């Protein structure tokens, strides 16, 4: 390998690493114009120099390796809590980014196969392939749509408002085009090329204007006040509760203290995911005395707790969100359907168990997948609330959360302590912002060792218990908003954008002297 090629390959990794700076919590958005433009220019340059298409897979893979290595390193922190898993840390630090980088390798590989001769058409093909592959990454197998480049805008809410129409994948496709568009100016053959570049910059300005009007319309909408409070608890209880046989009573008392229940006030309390150690749904009744002492008939609790059921002589475990009254009568429950690979279940269990692998949580027992996600209707004792339950990283899936948008509120419970003081919990939180905008619904997020918050349909955080803190926030009023276009049609809109790009590619390809 000659020195020049070696430098080029290292540069691709560095470009991917720099691109990570655009993601939460750093959000240096402007670096994407530099990195995406250089990556596209590199592929164009190499396409004119040699015809070895297999090399192009390697180019994209290196860019993806640098990108995912720097923004997903925190996954390995989840292996530090148990001595049995520490030997896997060096493997996960490299293997997870290396696997996800395969998708970026496919981007550059398919690009060189399908690349037209004309610059603008090539640019559109690059953007389209990138956008489609990112959709595939978020859908195939269990799907992992983490750190799409659209999250660079996670603190620019006016721009993000357009996701209420075109969704996350639609805006992600646009972002790829926007960040790569300076390459058209650099490679321009005619003024028409420059016009395409200008078009994307004008469009992003239009998105900002739309977002500003959308914000004003929302802020002028009618407020609706509940006659009860929804109290969202954010706790900071150590994960040692799972490993040191911590008495569940002490954890329950801590949560009650944070919740600060007042018996005369009508309140729905929301506690984080899996917060009670070594207690299943059926065992919680043993602590009825503690709940009945501190809560009244004016109270309901939404608790993240594991459930068990016997199926053909074996025990199935579920990660559940359950609704109780103050006497711990179970009113409704949801079992998580999108499980975390290796964290909550072991893929290819029969094979991987032979080499000593097991799931990290639930005392090494894999969770089972719930049947479906139904809206939970709390209609008891003059409480009227319909919630969409989401547990932990189920919040990351765009366009797959609900078929019926007839609910009042998204309740998302999570345990972010597995990722320590890293950027992981902050990236996790950023997904909630886009889901709120897409759905046009408020999100009530209760988290242990993370960020608990009320997020409105603009994606704005109205109240929060910050990272590393304990406390609660009360949600009592909301603004009414019309159902979003995306909530009606979902990712079908992304499909329409794909067809639009294909039409433009063929149109520009027909134009002589592009």
Predicted segments — roles?
Residues 2-218, 421-422, 432-435, 447-452, ...:
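Membrane-embedded alpha-helical bundles of multi-pass enzymes
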